[in-house]
Amino acid sequence: MKEELKKSLRTYGALLLLGVTGVPLGAAVGLIEALFCRLLLKVTAIRVAHLFWCLPFLAMAGLVIVAVNQKFGGRGKGGMSLIFDVAYEEETELPLRMIPLAMLSTALTHLFGGSAGREGVAVQIGAVFSYFAGKKLPFKNAPGIFLVTGMAAGFAGMFGTPIAAVIFAVEVLAAGEMRYEALLPAFTASFSASAVASLLGIRKENLAVHISESLTPFLLVRLITLGIIFGITGGLFAWCLKHTKKYLGEKIKNPLVRVFSIGVILSILFLLLYRGRYCGFGTNLVEAVFHGEKVYAYDWALKFILTILTLSAGFQGGEVTPLFTIGATLGAVLGNLFGIPVELSAALGYAAVFGGGTNTLLAAIFIGGEIFGYDYLPYFFIVCTAAYVFNRNSSIYCRQKLTKYSC
């Protein structure tokens, strides 16, 4: 009895210590994320103010990105794939140089007009920093636990959604499985990172929806149908990204030639298509949806295509923010077709296409709750569940373990 009590006390003591350790780790990650976010906001402002000076140099920026990563990246060129390999213990090292290289590459992509996000880099920053710290700490399985902890902190520091960040980090590595051993430090690190980033002026998107819509059987059918469409869209994005990268890699084997040639094409397209409307994160399109500004029926499709081309060419950045944009703009179009308030359908698309693209369920539901308000959690649950079932196990993270069933 005494031995069992001692064992329990040691277990709970270690668990508590893990949770406490997550606080300073999260704070450090939150500081880095805040600086990174400010950098991205600054280069975005420069691009918007001087679009016709920046876009012509997109191809040249691509050359710099690829050349620098080829020379200095080493194994770190694997990006999120390397993060997943380390989580599965197929690799054992995450070089610290991944952090500055990823930040520089993403900043150049956005300065010169590429269509990309920031989440992938934010998660990499958190994962690399926390994994490195975890190797110095005297905990069992510390590097793996703190890898997940850092992913949560990175997501929360960038997006200001700590609950969704925790769930995303423990859910995303293997579809259908949760890394519960990292739950407590991920929780404390996530809230710590979010708080520090907020203190430094980084605010989450607040896109509250103010619509009263009773959940009738007819609405339920329409919500499920929306979820199916959103899930297919997110899954299709992941599938197209994977196969476009493969196709371009086979057709244009030299990465410098590939990024330059496609960069030239992209710079022309971005200029012709509403003068940079589809450059960058796409938050301008999300704001247009929720502020009642002009939204074209094909906005989502053009953002879809241009983001895939940008990332497949060799430019750097995440996929999640474009997924939010694709979902919101597609949702705005479908809301009119399905007789659902545009704000509500756009909010549902924002979360569900993210879930369909990342092959996550709970993270998508809570992203919806944290961004748009928890009053609509039942709607997010219905739509995101349908999206998760119908995304066909596709994921933007090609190294994600697919343990959930296939439809």
Q: Each predicted region: which residue ranges?
A:
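Alpha-helical transmembrane segments and immediately membrane-proximal extracytoplasmic
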Residues: 1-407
